[in-house]
């Protein structure tokens, strides 16, 4: 509805968690790959720089203002590209106020601790 935009609640929560479940990590990655995204409710493919981790964090900063948010990662997207697991962790840490890992069981069962540590170091958390 036209009034939907008037009912935000960002000021009422301590921290917002978003799912930055993108395999394009930087704006450069997104522009190079020219990725299209199909969400569950889309009738056609979508494009926009917010469909990468860096772009999503920039857009959320714009929307949320001074309110904190953490970027979430979807670990199983990176089974075949462990380097990008480290990159997405680092990018989320650098550009947001925290990191949400979905789901820790993937890190445990696939022994991805080295990649997590590397991402946290590159992100400035270790």
Which stretches of residues belong to each language-model region?
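Distinct, well-ordered alpha-helical segments
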Residues: 2-9
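Substrate-binding cleft of secreted/luminal carbohydrate-active enzymes
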Residues: 12-32, 36-126
């Amino acid at each position: 509805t036209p009034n939907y935009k008037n009912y935000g609640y960002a000021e009422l929560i301590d921290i917002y968690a978003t799912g930055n479940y993108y395999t394009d990590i930087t704006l450069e990655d997104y522009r190079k790959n020219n990725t299209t995204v199909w969400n569950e409710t889309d009738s056609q493919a979508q494009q926009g720089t917010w469909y990468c981790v860096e772009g999503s964090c920039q857009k959320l900063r714009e929307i949320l203002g001074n309110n904190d948010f953490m970027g979430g990662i979807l670990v199983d997207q990176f089974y075949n590209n462990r380097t990008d697991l480290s990159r997405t962790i680092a990018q989320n840490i650098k550009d947001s106020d925290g990191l949400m890992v979905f789901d820790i069981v993937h890190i445990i069962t696939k022994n991805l601790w080295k990649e997590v540590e590397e991402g946290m170091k590159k992100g400035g958390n270790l």
